[in-house]
Every structure is written in structure tokens, then in C-alpha cells.
């Protein structure tokens, strides 16, 4: 595939509330890039850094963790701190493996934040377009 017709694949780990926004986006037929794949998770703080790296090694060009933030029904406000710590470890792991940190993003998305989710996906998609295909071993 040439870089001119590059269409990045984005994996979204969507926590409980953020997944509701994704579901609402589908129900309202909100437009966003169709090159996204969702994995529903109970809480963003459960995502291990090695799973982020694994997604890249399996061919994804970008990963978005859509967190419920302090709306998390499982951890409440503690979700933000734990997710942030895991994200920092993921950034370190990506750097050690030669993967640009711009390919990984964490965002707090509430259950009714369809537009915020769409914008996060669009922004990541544009970043990935400018970076081009991922180069992993």
C-alpha cells in the first residue's frame, strides 16, 4: 500500500460510559471514520500497557483508550489516576519499541459525548495520516 492511499486502522478500547457514546453515535448515524474497531471494557484502568503494544504489533496504526473518567461506575475518580499511570507505562513501552507516542491516545468520554468521541477519532485519524503506516518489526 502506498502512503497516498494509506487508511489507518484504529483500535478503540472503550470503557463502559465511553462505549455508550459510541453506541449513541451509531444510533444517531453520526459520521466518523469507519476504520475504527471497538473493544468494550469495563474500566480503562484495566488496560495493560502490553496490550497497547500488542495491538500495534497486530497491525493497528493507532490506539485510543476511551475512558469513562470520573463517571466510571467501577472505580469513580480513582479511574483517572490509575488509567494515567498505565498510559505513561504504555508510552514508555511504545518508545522502547520505536513506536511514535502520537499513535496512542487516552481521552475521557462521557456516555452522551458523541461529538467528543467523534472528534477524538477524527483527530487521531488525521495524526495517523500524517505519520503514515506504522513501521514495526
Tell what function each PLM region has.
Residues 1-137:
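Iron-sulfur-associated redox domains of electron-transfer enzymes in respiratory
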Amino acid at each position: 500500500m502506498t502512503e497516498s492511499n494509506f487508511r489507518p486502522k484504529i483500535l478503540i478500547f472503550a470503557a463502559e460510559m465511553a462505549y455508550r457514546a459510541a453506541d449513541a453515535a451509531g444510533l444517531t448515524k453520526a459520521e466518523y471514520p469507519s476504520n475504527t474497531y471497538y473493544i468494550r471494557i469495563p474500566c480503562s484502568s484495566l488496560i495493560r500497557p502490553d496490550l497497547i503494544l500488542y495491538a500495534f504489533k497486530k497491525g493497528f496504526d493507532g490506539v485510543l483508550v476511551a475512558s469513562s473518567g470520573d463517571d466510571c461506575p467501577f472505580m469513580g475518580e480513582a479511574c483517572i489516576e490509575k488509567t494515567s499511570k498505565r498510559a505513561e507505562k504504555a508510552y514508555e513501552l511504545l518508545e522502547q519499541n520505536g513506536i511514535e507516542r502520537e499513535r496512542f491516545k487516552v481521552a475521557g468520554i462521557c456516555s452522551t459525548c458523541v461529538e467528543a468521541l467523534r472528534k477524538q477519532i477524527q483527530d487521531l485519524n488525521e495524526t495517523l495520516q500524517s505519520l503514515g503506516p506504522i513501521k514495526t518489526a
